Amino acid sequence: MASASQKGWMVPPGLAFLSFSAEAWRAHAEASMPRFYFDVAEYKRYFEIGQPPWTPGVSVHYALDKALSMMLDEGLDEVFSRHVRAAERVRAGVADLGLSLLPDLSCASNTITAVNLPEGINGADMLRIMREEHDVVLAGGQQSLSGKIFRIGHLGLVSDEDIDGVFSALKLTLAKLRG
């Protein structure tokens, strides 16, 4: 398993979380390919003596400690339920604007929503206006979806007011782009 501090942990980028099965460790030990940049065995050796192999991002560790405390105080069931409610609110906002989702609802995420760009709307212009005029940062599509979709993240501590603000800005932005 792999994760990163900015992926729902309510922490800035800077930490990676990795977990390996016994089988994965055996495969690593038997692998012969060179390890030029990152070797998990190095981290494992240092972990066993209670130290990191290099200077860690200490402030990010403190942020993680605080975020984990907040999640435990809220309760994990409530954290997961909050993400479901946020996803439902975002999907309702998408529908209210007459937009369509990229994925089928059966496989839609509770942490990010991919939305098809409306016909005739330039995605780069939309993202720029959202950012520059409304202080709202959305993500575009990647690779084959570049210029075809945009993504609304609702991962971590996202309130109803945050979501409503995104859709207020999006409504204004789409109206401006449609002329």
Regions found by a protein language model. Give the residues of each.
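General beta-strand structural signal in soluble alpha/beta enzymes
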Residues: 1-4, 11, 138-140
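Active-site C-terminal subdomain of aminotransferase-like
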Residues: 6-92, 96
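Flexible, glycine/charged-enriched surface loops at secondary-structure junctions
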Residues: 74-82, 96-105, 141-142, 178-179
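Small/polar glycine-rich anion-binding or flexible loop at a beta-alpha turn
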Residues: 87, 106-112, 143-151
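A common structural junction motif
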Residues: 131-138, 171-177
